[in-house]
């Protein structure tokens, strides 16, 4: 499995180093019991920024989950970023989920659009249109179908990181972004896509199949 990233995300290294050093200093000067709450915080930071490799399903028409979390939306809507009717599937990430974002399909980035906004609870439907967000529109390499991935900031998450640009080619499971401390990813698919998940279901980035696309003849 080719996943060329450290098991602890680079985005978390400064936080982890700071938490570790403060815990160590308090431990050395005041003892273990005074430092215990700080060590617990350090362990929380460590688990929050974990970024493990994941197996990728072989089905060529599968759309993979872009993030770990829980399904909160499966419905037909308008895709405001690609201007079409679409099937929308949303993944809500709480603070205990892995927060790296990974490409759902193989394809080329056709459009990248950032929107400033609010920071309401990402579990709410209005977060998709009111919160700070970053949309990546991907045209599938195999058949030209469009898949839109939208990183949505949450109540605690105030920083969306996106590492791709227009013209880049992405592979399924490729890491393309990160959102800190609780957030959401909206996935807009062709309206003919067949959902493979239901509301409330827990999913894993790159491993869970969200939907299957029809073959384009």
From Swiss-Prot:
InterPro entries: PS_Dcarbxylase (IPR003817), PSD-A (IPR033175). Binds 1 pyruvoyl group covalently per subunit. It is a peripheral membrane protein. It catalyses: a 1,2-diacyl-sn-glycero-3-phospho-L-serine + H(+) = a 1,2-diacyl-sn-glycero-3-phosphoethanolamine + CO2. It is found in: Cell membrane. The active site is at 183 (schiff-base intermediate with substrate). The keyword DNA-binding does not apply. Belongs to the phosphatidylserine decarboxylase family. PSD-A subfamily. NCBIfam families: AS_decarb, PRK05305.1-2, PRK05305.1-5. This is Phosphatidylserine decarboxylase proenzyme.
């Amino acid at each position: 499995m080719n996943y060329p990233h450290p098991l602890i995300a680079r985005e978390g290294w400064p936080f982890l180093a700071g938490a570790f050093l403060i815990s160590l200093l308090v431990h050395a000067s005041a003892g273990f019991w005074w430092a215990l709450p700080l060590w617990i915080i350090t362990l929380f930071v460590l688990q929050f920024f974990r970024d493990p490799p994941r197996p990728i399903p072989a089905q060529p028409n599968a759309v993979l989950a872009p993030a770990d979390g829980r399904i909160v939306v499966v419905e037909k809507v308008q895709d405001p970023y690609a201007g079409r009717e679409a099937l929308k599937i949303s993944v809500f990430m709480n603070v205990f989920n892995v927060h790296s974002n990974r490409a759902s399909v193989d394809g080329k980035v056709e459009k990248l659009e950032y929107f400033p906004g609010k920071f309401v609870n990402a579990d709410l439907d209005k977060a998709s249109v009111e919160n700070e967000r970053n949309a990546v529109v991907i045209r599938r390499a195999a058949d030209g179908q469009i898949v839109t991935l939208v990183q949505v900031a949450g109540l605690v998450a105030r920083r969306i990181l996106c590492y791709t640009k227009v013209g880049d080619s992405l592979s399924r499971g490729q890491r393309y972004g990160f959102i800190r401390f609780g957030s959401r990813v909206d996935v807009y698919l062709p309206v003919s896509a067949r959902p493979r998940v239901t509301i409330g279901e827990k999913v894993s980035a790159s491993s869970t199949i969200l939907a299957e696309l029809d073959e384009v003849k």
